Structures are given as structure tokens and as C-alpha cells.
Design a protein with these regions (language model features):
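Gly/lys/ser-thr-rich phosphate-binding loops in alpha/beta enzymes
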Residues: 54-92, 117, 123, 127-128
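Hard-cation-handling environments
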Residues: 111, 121, 125-172
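Beta-strand segments within the central parallel beta-sheet cores of soluble alpha/beta enzyme folds
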Residues: 9-14, 76-79, 130-131
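Thiamine diphosphate
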Residues: 1-37, 45-72
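Structural signal for hydrophobic packing residues in well-ordered secondary-structure cores
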Residues: 4, 19, 61-72, 118-119, ...
């Protein structure tokens, strides 16, 4: 990232750290304490933030953006969170990580935690939260219904110069 002629002016690397590989315990998945330790080789600052705290995530994202803009160097955000369900429909993470997933099952969702906070401070009412969730669910349902008859357009990125590879002459 600091090689002359190849600088990008910095980049923001956002790690959604669910603390687990497909079936690998974190202590067996790397030789360093954090999954973001590789960023130390380019001296990028690393911010670790709790994924259950949307305001903290937003705050850290703003700091990272300001750092990148001011110093034009890479920065890393390590959002520590968890995957409530498996990697896909066939994965049952409780088989390989039973203790972790027992704790996750007992832990409230990020939406529940943040909604409770907003209601407690008077920013929203529970009726507001319920209405927002109902609207979002209705949106998801309508998008799912729309996708059932969806036919993608022909890949237009293969038109033009790339439609006949090898026929254009390279100019040097």
C-alpha cells in the first residue's frame, strides 16, 4: 500500500469478524491473536468494535474515514460479532461449536438490543419499532415475490470492446 507508483491514497478494510471459521475454532485458525494482525505489516491502525453496538460501529467508521482522508493510508475496522445461523442452509454450527452457539442462542439480537435502547431513551416507541420491522419484512417479502419471475439481462459487459477478444490492437 505504500509502494511508490502503486499507492491508492489509503483504503478502509472492514472485517466482519464472526469469530469462527466454517468449523475451525479461532485459536486453531491463525498464529496471531487477532484476524486483523496482518495489517500491522503496513502499520495500519486497527479499530476493534462491538458489532452489537451500531452507534459504536458508526463512530469507528467515521474515525477510520477521517484517518484515511487525512493520512491517505490504509485503516482496518474489526467488527467483532457472531453468526446467529450457519454459513448456509445446511450448516448447523451447534455441532462444531456447541458452547458458543448455546451462548449465541441465549443472546438477544442486535436489533433487539438497539431497539430496547432507543425505546428506553425515548427516541422511538415500541409501536415505532414494530412498524419499522413490519415495513422491512413487507419489503423483503415483496422483493422475494418479485425475484421468482426475474430473468437477468444478457451480460452487457461482454459487448463493445470485449465482444471479440484479441481483435483490438494494444497501443503503447
Amino acid at each position: 500500500s505504500g509502494l511508490r507508483g502503486h499507492r491508492t491514497g489509503g483504503s478502509i478494510h472492514f472485517v466482519i469478524n464472526n469469530q469462527i471459521g466454517f468449523t475451525t475454532n479461532p485459536k486453531f485458525s491463525r498464529s496471531s491473536p487477532y484476524c486483523t494482525d496482518m495489517a500491522k505489516m503496513v502499520e495500519a491502525p486497527i479499530f476493534h468494535v462491538n458489532g452489537d453496538d451500531p452507534e459504536a460501529v458508526t463512530h469507528v467508521a467515521k474515525i477510520a474515514t477521517e484517518f484515511r482522508m487525512k493520512f491517505q493510508k490504509p485503516v482496518v475496522i474489526d467488527m467483532c460479532c457472531y453468526r446467529r445461523h450457519g454459513h448456509n442452509e445446511t450448516d448447523e454450527p451447534a455441532f462444531t461449536q456447541p458452547k458458543m452457539y448455546k451462548a449465541i442462542k441465549a443472546h438477544p439480537t442486535t436489533v433487539a438490543i438497539y431497539s430496547k435502547k432507543l425505546v428506553a431513551e425515548g427516541t422511538l416507541t415500541q409501536a415505532d419499532v414494530d412498524a419499522m420491522q413490519a415495513r422491512f419484512r413487507a419489503h423483503l417479502d415483496s422483493e422475494l415475490a418479485a425475484s421468482e419471475g426475474f430473468k437477468p439481462n444478457k451480460a452487457d459487459w461482454l459487448d463493445g470492446r470485449w465482444s471479440t477478444p484479441g481483435t483490438d490492437r494494444l497501443l503503447y
